[in-house]
Amino acid sequence: QAERKGNKEMMKKSDTFFNPPETIHEGNPQEILDRKEKVVMLPMLIMQGGLDDNVIPEIQEKFAATYRAAGGECQLEIFKNSEHEWTAVPSAEADLSHETVKQFIAKQLRTLQKKAA
């Protein structure tokens, strides 16, 4: 995505983080599921900015569908008016994202409590 858009700063960060470059595939969650590796499928919350041009929404939609197809529980929330890293900037959508996390955690705790009872 960074190369396609000519985002030199993101390309530099990717080159630094994924060194050697082929390591980008080793730990890529989508590719792990595509390879049908054995993994623990914990409940997952994905929050995506609808205007994010770093990790585009379609990538998260595909991953959520793949995760569900592999037997995992995945809640995907797309915040239509948000870009990348919007949760760190005070706004109504950031507040909603924080509430979404709280609700997701509360749901997981209720599920664990029911199993323990």
Model-flagged regions — what are they?
Residues 92-117:
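Catalytic active-site module of serine/aspartate enzymes centered on a nucleophile-bearing elbow/loop
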Residues 21, 44, 73-74:
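Hydrophobic anchor at the start of a short beta-strand
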Residues 53-62:
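Conserved alpha/beta-hydrolase "acid-adjacent" motif
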Residues 68-85:
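Catalytic histidine neighborhood in serine/cysteine hydrolases
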Residues 1-35:
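Mobile cap/lid helix-loop segments that gate and shape the active-site cleft of serine hydrolases
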Residues 30-41, 58-59:
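Conserved serine/cysteine hydrolase catalytic core
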Residues 39-40, 45-48, 52:
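Short beta-strand/loop motif that positions the catalytic acidic residue
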Residues 82-95:
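Catalytic histidine-centered segment of alpha/beta-hydrolase-like enzymes
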